[in-house]
């Protein structure tokens, strides 16, 4: 039996609360059509208080697995009977699947972050030092990716220093916590600068100047933002003006979807320019560029 026959009729999902904004159905729908797989991928809105029962009934509802987004990533971590290495390190699950009747959880955010940089800024992991702006949930995946790829020194900057200290303590050696007032000084020797804050994204001061001068960064430094709405954030605009190589956050969204699709439907999809343009067209239609 070939892979397409095995995947026939398989169902997968993305769940969050709210979920109508998700572009995951567009991504997976594109791949299902491209690969000629007779499967489906749907958005399912689940309230936080209902998540445990939803996760427990995946098989009964005919799902092979699915993606989990805000606010359910920690609840999915708790619900999974088995976790992959990335999920254990990050403390959150964004991908669920069933294996011999057991609910398994993984985290593909770190993979997506690194794969996006591999595609758009090859050699980025030669940087000895990285600067991560923000210490929220998303920054954990970024730090895990950086450590996994051998970055020697990761500085995490946050307005609330205790959040950065908590993250540094979680990962241990090679991760250092700093207050926001130290960010400017840290830019000068950072080979990779990652923005994980909401500054400059839609509804969070878009159009305003990013509050850090990037002109003192090494000329070979790479600047990347995990935000993809808007596509060109205030941070990326400022980095570009400073002459730095910039990588937007859309690629992370596309690449993080690859491992889950392969698990549920049995074929590994490709992140192509055609897929990117498909998502950009939807973003333009929604006024999200």
UniProtKB/Swiss-Prot annotation:
Which InterPro entries does this entry report, sorted A to Z? Aminoacid_DH-like_N_sf (IPR046346), NAD(P)-bd_dom_sf (IPR036291), SDH_C (IPR041121), Shikimate_DH (IPR011342), Shikimate_DH-bd_N (IPR013708), Shikimate_DH_fam (IPR022893), Shikm_DH/Glu-tRNA_Rdtase (IPR006151)
Q: Which residues bind shikimate?
A: 22-24, 69, 94, 109, 228
State the GO CC annotations: cytosol
Task: Give the active-site positions.
Answer: 73
User: Which pathway, metabolic or otherwise, does it act in?
Assistant: Metabolic intermediate biosynthesis; chorismate biosynthesis; chorismate from D-erythrose 4-phosphate and phosphoenolpyruvate: step 4/7
Top EC class for this record: oxidoreductase
Instruction: Return the EC number.
Output: 1.1.1.25
Reactions catalysed: shikimate + NADP(+) = 3-dehydroshikimate + NADPH + H(+)
Q: Which Gene3D superfamilies does the entry mention?
A: Leucine Dehydrogenase, chain A, domain 1 (3.40.50.10860), NAD(P)-binding Rossmann-like Domain (3.40.50.720)
What SUPFAM superfamilies does the record point to? Aminoacid dehydrogenase-like, N-terminal domain, NAD(P)-binding Rossmann-fold domains
- Name the domain of life: Bacteria
Binding positions for NADP(+) per the UniProt entry = 85, 134-138, 158-163, 226, 249
Q: Which UniProt keywords apply?
A: Amino-acid biosynthesis, Aromatic amino acid biosynthesis, NADP, Oxidoreductase
| A GO MF term | shikimate 3-dehydrogenase (NADP+) activity
GO BP? amino acid biosynthetic process; aromatic amino acid family biosynthetic process; chorismate biosynthetic process; shikimate metabolic process
Q: State the family named in the UniProt similarity comment for this chain.
A: Belongs to the shikimate dehydrogenase family.
UniProt function note: Involved in the biosynthesis of the chorismate, which leads to the biosynthesis of aromatic amino acids. Catalyzes the reversible NADPH linked reduction of 3-dehydroshikimate (DHSA) to yield shikimate (SA).
Q: How does it assemble?
A: Homodimer.
Can you name this protein?
Answer: Shikimate dehydrogenase (NADP(+))
| Source organism of the structure | Brucella canis (strain ATCC 23365 / NCTC 10854 / RM-666)
Gene encoding it?
aroE
